Amino acid sequence: MKQYLDFMRHVYEHGTEKSDRTGTGTRSVFGYQMRFDLNEGFPVVTTKKLHLKSIIHELLWFLQGSTNIKYLKDNGVTIWDEWADANGELGPIYGYQWRAWPTPDGRHIDQITEVVQQIRDNPDSRRLIVSAWNVGEIPQMKLPPCHAFFQFYVADGKLSCQLYQRSADIFLGVPFNIASYALLTHMIAQQCDLGVGDFVWTGGDCHIYSNHFEQVETQLSREPMKLPTLRIKHRPDSIFDYKYDDFELVGYESHPAIKAPVAV
């Protein structure tokens, strides 16, 4: 994950000081891209330990179409707690938009089901897209989508994915997002009888919070380790039937975790 460290270093050394919604303050650049060949290892940060349980359960929760944190809480995942209301509700966020995008005539579109079917039936389509950025429902969301839009691409029997992330918390958020969408790409590739190609991460406002500077310096001082490989233990009937125990990262070694506050 040298690419990630190069990205972090670039923003830390060359970013512009900016204010932000949370009042924390950031150092930021606009526009950055990283490309990861998923055949060279699973792109998980090794210069600090990631909570893989949270990454996997969050993705499974998105795929359920859920907007309530109960599933996450039941599985020991707390990453959405700060934004949920007293009943655990978050409004029409990622999972709802992925699985039940509302139409003007009262129907709902399951974007995940549709994109998987399109990949199978028309892999050369340039419309293999899922969007969470529903302008009409943003006011009802506790947190508007940071990773807002993703597109698939099939070539030479391999599935690639590109994510556009409008707001990128480089220290805390981006490592989760890279791993999550790489995992989703592997899952959909398996469901569509394809190999994996590249995961392309594209960021808009790419920032380091001012209260993460010390942690960033620590992380930049560490040498990355060899990437692990992802093992999916079996193929379920659909993209929605994967379970936490279906996934194993083989050979994952990392430096110790680095704690940092979340800007809410």
Curated annotation (Swiss-Prot):
Report the active site residues: C146
Keyword terms, alphabetized: Cytoplasm, Methyltransferase, Nucleotide biosynthesis, Transferase
The reply on keyword Transferase is yes
- Annotated InterPro entries: Thymidate_synth/dCMP_Mease, Thymidate_synth/dCMP_Mease_dom, Thymidate_synth/dCMP_Mease_sf, Thymidylate_synthase, Thymidylate_synthase_AS
GO terms for biological process?
dTMP biosynthetic process; dTTP biosynthetic process; methylation
Q: What is its EC number?
A: 2.1.1.45
Q: Which reaction does it catalyse?
A: dUMP + (6R)-5,10-methylene-5,6,7,8-tetrahydrofolate = 7,8-dihydrofolate + dTMP
GO cellular component terms attached to this protein's record: cytosol
TM annotation in the entry = none
Give the binding site residues for dUMP.
Answer: R21, R126, R127, R166, S167, A168, D169, N177, H207, I208, Y209
Q: Its pathway?
A: Pyrimidine metabolism; dTTP biosynthesis
Which amino acids does the record list as binding (6R)-5,10-methylene-5,6,7,8-tetrahydrofolate? H51, D169, A263
Query: What is a single molecular function from GO for this protein?
Result: thymidylate synthase activity
Subcellular locations according to the entry: Cytoplasm
Would the keyword Isomerase turn up in this protein's UniProt record? no
Q: How does it assemble?
A: Homodimer.
**What is the documented function of this protein?**
Catalyzes the reductive methylation of 2'-deoxyuridine-5'-monophosphate (dUMP) to 2'-deoxythymidine-5'-monophosphate (dTMP) while utilizing 5,10-methylenetetrahydrofolate (mTHF) as the methyl donor and reductant in the reaction, yielding dihydrofolate (DHF) as a by-product. This enzymatic reaction provides an intracellular de novo source of dTMP, an essential precursor for DNA biosynthesis.
Record's PANTHER family?
A: THYMIDYLATE SYNTHASE, THYMIDYLATE SYNTHASE 1
**Family, per the entry?**
Belongs to the thymidylate synthase family. Bacterial-type ThyA subfamily.
Protein name per the record? Thymidylate synthase
State which gene encodes it.
thyA
